[in-house]
């Protein structure tokens, strides 16, 4: 299935648009159905099995709910984490930041383009349902930038395959709104399969790359520095 990138409605809506609010709520449900927070928590714990992470950056963080669910799973073993949530829109509520604080995670939200976020290094950078928005040229640029700022990059994206595409057309049946139903199909068509992200990673030497299908609907990519 050829990768096709098209604009998504949610990206063009103001954060306070009722359709955007409803669609973000839908996305929280979809992430739960896909099990993406379980996948991310498991990958983090496997990669940092001998010590907890201290600094984590999420790019394309949306409303922050995804990383919050991940934090709720790992916070008992990983306290006092500094988390930076980066998104192009101001979507993260005070309630979400307070929920992070209740887990002893210090969290900051930055409104910034992913290509212009603060020049800092982090133990790990994560992304969930975000990279599929970019074509290969921009992806290569983004991956090159990330490889210089972290020793671990974990990504979960839509799996570009017939079964996820079929299921994406049925989201109306679980009450998702028109924005979500439209964007879900586009997201799967722009998703990844095989080793497409590995092929775009700028440094092969000194990195361990893992890329595979994860569950029924997701695609997992991990780049971990070995030297």
Place the predicted regions along the sequence by residue.
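Class I SAM-dependent methyltransferase SAM/SAH-binding core
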Residues: 57, 63-116
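C-terminal alpha-helical "lid/dimerization" subdomain adjacent to the S-adenosyl-L-methionine
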Residues: 158-204, 211
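Core SAM-dependent methyltransferase catalytic element
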Residues: 209-227
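Conserved beta-strand signature within the Rossmann-like core of class I S-adenosyl-L-methionine
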Residues: 150-159
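A conserved beta-strand element that flanks and buttresses the S-adenosyl-L-methionine
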Residues: 126
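A short, conserved alpha-helix within the catalytic core of class I
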Residues: 134-145
């Amino acid at each position: 299935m050829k990768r096709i990138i098209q604009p998504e409605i949610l990206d063009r809506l103001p954060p306070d648009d009722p359709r955007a609010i409803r669609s973000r709520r839908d996305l929280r449900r979809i992430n739960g159905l896909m099990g993406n927070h379980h996948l991310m928590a498991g990958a983090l714990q496997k990669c940092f099995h001998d010590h907890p992470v201290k600094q984590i950056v999420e790019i394309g963080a949306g409303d922050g709910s995804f990383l919050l669910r991940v934090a709720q799973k790992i916070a008992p073993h990983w306290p006092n984490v500094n988390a930076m949530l980066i998104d192009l829109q101001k979507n993260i509520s005070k309630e979400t930041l307070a929920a992070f604080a209740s887990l002893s995670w210090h969290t900051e939200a930055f409104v910034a383009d992913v290509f212009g976020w603060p020049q800092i290094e982090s133990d790990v950078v994560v992304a969930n349902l975000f990279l599929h928005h970019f074509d290969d040229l921009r992806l290569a640029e983004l991956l090159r930038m990330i490889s210089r700022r972290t020793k671990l990059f974990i990504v979960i994206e839509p799996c570009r395959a017939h079964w996820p595409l079929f299921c994406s057309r049925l989201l109306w049946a679980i009450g998702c709104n028109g924005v979500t139903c439209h964007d879900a199909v586009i997201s799967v068509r722009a998703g990844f399969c095989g080793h497409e992200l590995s092929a775009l990673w700028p440094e092969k030497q000194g990195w361990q790359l893992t890329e595979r299908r994860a569950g029924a609907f997701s695609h997992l990519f991990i780049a971990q520095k070995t030297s």
